[in-house]
Amino acid sequence: MPPRNMHLFQRRENRIPMEIPVILDGHRLLPGAEATFTENVSAKGARVVSVRRWEKDAPMILASRTGEFRSEARVAYCQTLRGDGYAVGVEFLATSGRWVVES
């Protein structure tokens, strides 16, 4: 039996550690935009830090604070961080503009 925390899948793309200022919007219970940053990025998604707990598969909008990129997205996971906040895995669905990593 595999350990509880072992992922049973392998990522298709590499994650690059990079702090990018972003805005999250679309939380079902807490309306309003949240200014935050990424921890790592790929061409198809990002891991962001949020003060809000997001539900898996919830829709959201992620946009760069510069306005150069915007994506309808899906929450892939939400993990509690030590201290305050959450690490949220975001999968890009419908994008416009230029992201920091291209496929």
Regions found by a protein language model. Name each.
Residues 1-41, 51, 95-103:
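N-terminal helix initiation/capping motif
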Residues 8, 58-60, 74-77:
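Short beta-alpha junctions and helix-cap segments that line functional grooves
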Residues 20, 71-73, 88:
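Hydrophobic residues positioned within well-ordered beta-strands of beta-sheet architectures
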Residues 20-27, 57-69:
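Short conserved beta-strand and strand-loop elements enriched in small hydrophobics
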Residues 27, 43, 78-83:
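Short, conserved beta-turn/loop elements at beta-strand boundaries and strand-helix junctions
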Residues 46-50, 81-93:
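Short, solvent-exposed secondary-structure boundary/capping segments
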Residues 53-55:
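Short, well-ordered loop/turn sites that connect or cap secondary structure elements
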